[in-house]
């Protein structure tokens, strides 16, 4: 699986076991991602941050 990094033109191949791509947003600015990458399980959203996860190459 390949996931985008914070700068969308940069991407990396995920290590074994991390088979989801994610985007993390601050809830207050939910249109601008603050972090992107590979992750093993999709974290729960909280009062401050929102995660969007997907499982296809560079879908984040």
UniProtKB/Swiss-Prot annotation:
Job of this protein: Shows cytolytic activity on many different cells by forming pore in lipid membranes. In vivo, increases heart rate or kills the animal by cardiac arrest. In addition, it binds to heparin with high affinity, interacts with Kv channel-interacting protein 1 (KCNIP1) in a calcium-independent manner, and binds to integrin alpha-V/beta-3 (ITGAV/ITGB3) with moderate affinity.
Endpoints of the signal sequence: none
Disulfide bonds: 3-21, 14-38, 42-53, 54-59
Organism: Naja annulifera
Subunit structure: Monomer in solution; Homodimer and oligomer in the presence of negatively charged lipids forming a pore with a size ranging between 20 and 30 Angstroms.
Coarse class of the protein's main subcellular location: secreted
Protein name: Cytotoxin 10
Short name of any one Pfam family annotated for the protein: Toxin_cobra-type
């Amino acid at each position: 699986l390949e996931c985008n990094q914070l700068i969308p033109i940069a991407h990396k191949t995920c290590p074994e076991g991390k088979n989801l791509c994610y985007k993390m947003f601050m809830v207050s600015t939910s249109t601008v991602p603050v972090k992107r990458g590979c992750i093993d399980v999709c974290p729960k959203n909280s009062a401050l941050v929102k995660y969007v996860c997907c499982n296809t190459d560079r879908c984040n």
